[in-house]
Amino acid sequence: MRIVFLIFLSLFFTSYSYSSELNLFTSRHYPSDLILFKKFEEKTGIKVNVINAKSKVLEKRLLDEGSKSKGDVLFLADAGALYSAEEKKLFTKYNESQSLRLVPKSLKNDYWVGITKRARIIFYNPNLVDYNDIKNISYEDLSDERWTKSIAIRQSNNIYNQSLVASILEHRGENFTTKWLEKLVKNFSRKPQGNDRAQILSVAAGESKLAVANTYYYGLMLSGKKGDEQKKAAQKVKPIFPNQNDRGAHVNISGAGILKFSPNKKNAQSFIEFLLTKEAQTNLCNSSFEFPIIENVSTNKIINKIKNFKEDINIDVSTYGKRQAQAFKLMKKAGWN
């Protein structure tokens, strides 16, 4: 009887410990995320174990572990990365609770949901480019001869660039995109290199007239979190949102989904619902300078200055993943290193 009782206690405490944790696989690298995860722990009593790595590394680990995986939630930057994980059947469907219904349909599907937004836009040097000459610019205009040797942008293997080109493919078709890319690469001011902030620095220094970069990098630079030099550089450039006269600016997401073999699916669902509360959205966005995925969220003054623009909502962000391989192939063919 005593042995049976001890076995029961052992099973009880093992079960209790198991159900009171969450194993989060994330490619996001913001210290502020960890602070938010602590708040979730305090509110729910669910311990969050964070496994941080690049999306492809996380994807490979989950595939290698298969049904033995203890991963509960996969939280990744870029819809293309989420689509890749979905294609490999790493997710299970979530329950669409009230909070998840607040996310626009174009920013989620049955397996993952957008948590934050960012726009990939153009930054210009006002000492080199007149606002009136650029105020109505589109992504398509970046291939114009007037921008020869003027544009700073990252390499073709960058997923943000691949998603942008994927959106052009979806809107304009392969023939147009192929010709557009051939002209675009002639307008690069230098060999593509560095991160998004490096592109903005190039414009601030006068090396380039235009840069293509994500909005939150600009916010980070303006905030001073990346040092005084980068803050001063960001103050020298101006943001411009393309395609405001037609479809709107290209928008992408960070998003999360519940993993197929999650041992803690209820905790995983609760965690995703928590990320979509106004409190969590405020903390996420005011720290990372991304845009909230839901409405009526209080944001800081840096975000407030750039958050009112027309978004491209006529395209499902999952399309970026579907088109990325094709986009990358065309980018390389055009000579985009």
Segments and roles (model prediction):
Residues 4-14:
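Bacterial N-terminal signal peptides
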Residues 27, 31, 70-207, 221-222:
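Extracytoplasmic ligand-binding site segments that recognize negatively charged/polar headgroups
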Residues 101, 118, 181-185, 190-193, ...:
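Periplasmic-binding protein-like
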Residues 299-337:
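Extracellular/periplasmic bilobal clamshell ligand-binding domains
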Residues 20-84, 337:
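Early extracytoplasmic/lumenal segment of secretory-pathway proteins
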Residues 15-19:
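Sec/Tat signal peptide C-region and signal peptidase I cleavage site
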Residues 254-314:
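Mature extracytoplasmic/periplasmic domains
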